[in-house]
Regions:
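Short, acidic, metal-binding catalytic loop of nucleotide-sugar glycosyltransferases
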Residues: 19-32
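Short beta-strand-to-loop acidic/aromatic patch adjacent to the donor-nucleotide binding site
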Residues: 94-105
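Hydrophobic targeting segments
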Residues: 2-7, 24, 34-38
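Conserved catalytic core of nucleotide-sugar-dependent glycosyltransferases
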Residues: 104-168
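A conserved acidic beta->alpha catalytic loop
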Residues: 13, 38-50, 69-70, 104
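Active-site beta-to-alpha loop of glycosyltransferases that engages the nucleotide-sugar donor
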Residues: 7-22, 41, 73
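C-terminal catalytic/acceptor-binding lobe
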Residues: 151-152, 156-206
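Active-site-proximal specificity loops/subdomain of glycosyltransferases
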Residues: 46-94
Length: 206
């Protein structure tokens, strides 16, 4: 399975990105995958700093910057970054997207454990491994922080919401991850939630 690791980045998470890139370097040594980072910081300057981190950890990712309006909310900015990743998966001939957020440190065998679950059955379209919410101990976090998504889903569903086009579509971008999952399930696909397979997962906040 040809996998693209893709994640939005922003300068506000500079506190964790070098540790994350070191983690990526070790993981991709064990399970080869390409890396795409989509920056939505204010201006393109932050990319230079990220490239220095990549050089230090012998990574050669593709990094693009989206120049988005300052008034655009955080959730929409992230959604537009994910749409850029979706387009890269489709144009690059990848079989799956590994959505792995930069504030999560995972074991180097994590991806190799998720891939067989996605390949096991044709009806499994998404495999998401729960982690813990930083603010509330022992509360599961159901976002796309560590999630493997099959290409088939990305061919069908965009991350750009066309409000009013579907009566079940949310009115804001905040629950857009839940909406993506809902579309997959509504169309007969299977969304698999996994707990305990990948351990430990560190959700960084500083």
């Amino acid at each position: 399975m040809r996998v693209l690791i893709g994640t939005p980045i922003h300068e506000v998470k500079d506190y964790c990105i070098e540790r994350w890139l070191k983690n990526v370097s070790k993981l991709t040594h064990k399970t080869p995958a390409d890396l795409l980072m989509v920056d939505n910081s204010t201006g393109p300057a932050y990319i230079k700093k990220v490239r220095q981190y990549c050089k230090k950890h012998t990574l050669h990712p593709k990094i693009i910057h989206l120049e988005l309006p300052h008034t655009q909310g955080r959730y929409e900015r992230v959604a537009r970054c994910r749409e850029a990743i979706r387009q890269e998966v489709l144009s690059g001939g990848y079989d799956a997207w590994f959505s792995w957020e930069t504030d999560q440190i995972i074991p180097t065998d994590a991806l190799s454990k998720l891939i067989p679950l996605l390949e096991a059955k044709n009806f499994v379209k998404i495999v998401s491994h729960n982690n813990w919410t930083r603010q509330i101990p022992n509360l599961p976090n159901y976002d796309f922080g560590c999630t493997l998504i099959k290409r088939e889903c990305l061919e069908k569903y965009s991350f750009i919401l066309k409000f009013g086009s579907d009566p079940q579509m949310p009115a804001t971008y905040e629950p857009s991850e839940a909406w993506f999952r809902k579309q997959v399930i509504r169309d007969g696909g299977c969304y698999l939630e996994v707990q305990g397979l990948i351990n430990p997962i560190y959700h960084l906040n500083k």
